[in-house]
Amino acid sequence: NESCYWFPDYLADIDEIKKIFSPDKPLMLIGHSMGGNVASMYAGIFPENVSHLVNVEGFGLKESDPNNAPSRYQQWIEKQNDVQSFREYDSLYDLASRIKKRNQNISIERAIYVASQWAEKLDTGKIKLRADPKHKLPNATQYRRSEAEACWRLISAKTLCVFGKNSSFFKEVIPIQENNINKSWLNNSKTVEIPGAGHMIHLENPEFLANEIENFIMNE
């Protein structure tokens, strides 16, 4: 990317994927965290394009403060020419150790597997994340939760909301239900809690998560 990644582009990405892989049938969308937010917004923007939606801790951020806009624009401009490369590691084990440090519930063996999927080996023999560091650049515009909620209200897909039992993200659901989205997709969706997992459910308890998703898709 020449600059930062723009949030609306993620929505367009899903639409392009549908055109390529499922032009004649609705999608079954699964998204985690920001990906869950993107998937849920798309499901409201094009409800006819999504039959099933699995939102794994993807309810976005709290509403942003417009008063922070000047500093956000300043930060965006200043960071354009200050892209920081990802750290290099001596081995997969070193990267795996860092992954485990941030996700206490996974074993070192699983962390090594995750590291092998996330990383690439450089000519120097070092290990580096296989990702674009520009994805870390700030966006010029702040997150507008009210716009996301407007999209969520239009979701017609069968929906599964997934939370980690040890995650604080579950608290995000309470204000949503108590606000102005009564009789919405969220109140009519199925909600499950995954034991032994925080926010990174797909790393910490993937077997339990996969089972819940499979049951949801097969039985709905």
Explain the meaning of each model-derived region.
Residues 154-197:
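Conserved loop-alpha-helix segment in the C-terminal half of the alpha/beta-hydrolase fold
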Residues 197-206:
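Catalytic histidine-centered segment of alpha/beta-hydrolase-like enzymes
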Residues 56-89:
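A catalytic-pocket lid/entrance helix-loop region that shapes and gates access to the active site
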Residues 1-4, 64-67, 172-173:
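Conserved catalytic-core motifs of eukaryotic protein kinase domains, centered on the activation segment
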Residues 11, 24, 49-50, 186-189, ...:
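Core-facing hydrophobic residues within beta-strands of well-ordered domains
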Residues 24-69:
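Conserved hydrolase catalytic core segment
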Residues 1-30, 211:
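Active-site loop/oxyanion-hole signature of alpha/beta-hydrolase fold enzymes
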Residues 85-142:
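Conserved alpha/beta-hydrolase catalytic His-Asp/Glu region
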